[in-house]
């Protein structure tokens, strides 16, 4: 059905970026020809292989106009291609429309990834270029493996986008701060000793760290160098006797310097990390995660050293939250729940009465979060998606491009989170604004059934996220539905909202769900041109029961408490067990959140958490 022009703004102004993007690609090709480069790769990386980037490193966004958080562009003499996953297909099609860039949908059978594309389309004597300061060693190794049967040269010293990007933003210069032990639960010295214990098990003399969240975790420092991700750009190096932090020292105040030194951490300039690595004695064993170390730093490791590769030691340690962190997380989710309920009440009272758009709704939600003590910033850009915009999983409303006005009809998906001193939050609710279709109600209820099926599961110790993923998809599969993304991801503690190594996904993962791991559960239904539905809660893995015949079993303990919109639930599709779960959950929502609300908000919440049968 066509949208009435006087009711809604157009979703995307197609073609706005076209000429600019094509001009940039043309300029890039000229540079490539000058440097003897046949194909040039522009990934979504910074020197630390971060998922979310500071503006300075958004080279792929600059060259393509595609603003999603994941994707790779390859430019050759006669083609420009963008690869991205199912979360962004709709968004990517809109944002590159009219330009010469082609979209290759990652994960679709028969669609080559960019490694396969380069292997199949380049010939002997050709060359591949990339910026080795941002390209991870693991990707270089994979590229070498794919191209090994051809005489193709790798040229890794040129940041060609940097040469073209004349108004490139400066590198971030935010101040670092110390995360108090009352939040972290352990001092930096204690964490460094835990790292050394793991180094001993791996026979490692040194542990080289490039990933910002791991560095922030082990040294108990945080910063504002990346929007929504409280990290500070730096490198780390830990030996059996010493620990170093390489950082722009202007970012450190006296308190932070003193804390680091008290905890056995030496400080030096950011640019000197490679000098330190080059001086490591021959015969020493250096542990690295090749997916989190860039090619330039990898090349600084002396030839006489043995390189031990694996997942960062800190990745596994920080994934299992300690009791202090978990208790703080519970406090953060109460605060977040209060903000969400106040927002939902405000929305209910004002949609159709005052002008509310996707953008202004997201701003209002942030306003409610900022009222909570200890709130620092959002944990990611709020996804406030009305009607068919919600079919784009990581949609972002923007003034002048896409910004629907909310009406008293349809579904409104809000996926948001906050950074608090007590932890990082993430929550999604799909809200009924007025009349909805039977199809929308059915899809919402099927999503809810999948959510309940997984969140209430008991599972044997040793289970991985890929083992339990099917539980959330099963009700959808029975109706011929699925979602082209994972079901859940780990969440950091005042760190990245996406954290590994665990996840819940169809993609095989051998990481066991351990007690203390925090993870999201967020099944959904996404129908292009119609609607998007997602229900997300955050849980912590906990012990359940131990039996003579089964052994040790685990469960999910819920952290987030926000009402699930009953107006979208078809009770006839729910089992008695599912109804009981929903009633019990809503009872907890009311009991935990209502003490922090006004009288009118409490009355509203009581109705929204009423028992169903």
Stretch-by-stretch model annotation:
Residues 1:
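AAA+ ATPase active-site-proximal loops
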Residues 4-613:
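Active-site neighborhoods and metal-handling regions in enzymes and metal-associated proteins
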């Amino acid at each position: 059905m066509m949208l009435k022009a006087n009711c809604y703004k157009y979703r995307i102004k197609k073609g706005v970026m076209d000429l600019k993007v094509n001009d940039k690609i043309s300029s890039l090709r000229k540079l490539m020809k000058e440097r003897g480069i046949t194909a040039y790769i522009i990934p979504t990386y910074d020197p630390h292989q971060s998922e979310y980037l500071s503006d300075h490193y958004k080279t792929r966004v600059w060259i393509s106009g595609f603003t999603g958080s994941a994707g790779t562009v390859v430019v050759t003499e006669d083609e420009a291609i963008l690869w991205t996953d199912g979360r962004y297909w709709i968004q990517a099609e809109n944002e590159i429309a009219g330009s010469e860039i082609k979209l290759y949908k990652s994960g679709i059978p028969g669609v080559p990834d960019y490694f396969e594309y380069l292997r199949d389309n380049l010939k002997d004597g050709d060359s591949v270029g990339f910026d080795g300061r941002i390209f991870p060693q693991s990707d270089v190794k994979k590229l070498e493996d794919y191209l090994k049967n051809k005489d193709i040269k790798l040229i890794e010293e040129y940041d060609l986008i940097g040469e073209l990007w004349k108004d490139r933003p400066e590198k971030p210069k935010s101040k670092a701060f110390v995360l108090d032990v009352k939040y972290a639960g352990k001092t930096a010295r204690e964490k460094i000793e835990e790292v050394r214990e793991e180094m001993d098990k791996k026979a490692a003399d040194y542990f080289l760290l490039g990933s910002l969240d791991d560095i922030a975790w082990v040294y108990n420092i945080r910063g504002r160098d990346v929007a929504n991700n409280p990290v500070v750009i730096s490198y780390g190096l830990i030996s059996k006797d010493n620990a170093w932090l390489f950082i722009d020292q202007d970012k450190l105040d006296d308190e932070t310097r003193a804390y680091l030194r008290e905890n056995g951490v030496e400080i030096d300039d950011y640019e000197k990390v490679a000098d330190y690595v080059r001086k490591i004695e021959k015969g020493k064993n250096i542990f690295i995660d090749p997916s989190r170390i860039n090619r330039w730093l990898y090349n600084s490791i002396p030839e006489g050293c043995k390189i031990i590769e694996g997942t960062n030691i800190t990745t596994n340690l920080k994934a299992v939250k300690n009791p202090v962190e978990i208790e703080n997380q519970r406090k953060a989710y109460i605060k977040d729940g209060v903000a969400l309920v106040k927002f939902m009440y405000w929305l209910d009272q004002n949609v159709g009465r005052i002008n509310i758009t996707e953008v202004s709704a997201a701003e209002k939600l942030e306003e409610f979060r900022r009222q909570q003590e200890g709130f620092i910033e959002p944990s990611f850009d709020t996804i406030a998606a009305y009607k068919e915009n919600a079919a784009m999983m990581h949609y972002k409303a923007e003034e002048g491009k896409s910004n629907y006005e909310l009406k008293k009809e349809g579904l409104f998906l809000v996926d948001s989170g906050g950074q608090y001193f007590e932890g990082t939050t993430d929550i999604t609710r799909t809200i009924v604004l007025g009349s909805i279709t039977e199809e929308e109600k059915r899809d919402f209820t099927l999503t809810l059934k999948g959510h309940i099926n997984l969140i209430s599961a008991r599972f044997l110790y040793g289970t991985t996220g890929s083992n339990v993923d099917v539980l959330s998809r099963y009700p959808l599969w029975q109706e011929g539905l699925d979602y082209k993304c994972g079901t859940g991801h780990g969440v950091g503690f005042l760190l990245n909202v996406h954290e590994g190594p665990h996840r819940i996904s169809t993609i095989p993962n051998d990481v066991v769900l351990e007690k203390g791991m925090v993870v999201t559960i967020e099944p959904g239904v996404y129908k292009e041109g119609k609607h998007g539905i997602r229900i997300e809660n955050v849980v912590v893995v906990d012990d359940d029961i131990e039996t003579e015949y089964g052994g040790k079993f685990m469960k999910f303990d819920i952290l987030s408490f926000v009402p699930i919109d009953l107006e979208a639930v078809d009770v006839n599709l729910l089992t008695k067990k599912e109804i009981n779960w929903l009633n019990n959950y809503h009872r907890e929502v009311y009991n935990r959140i209502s003490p922090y609300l006004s009288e009118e908000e409490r009355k509203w919440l009581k109705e929204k958490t009423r028992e169903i049968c």
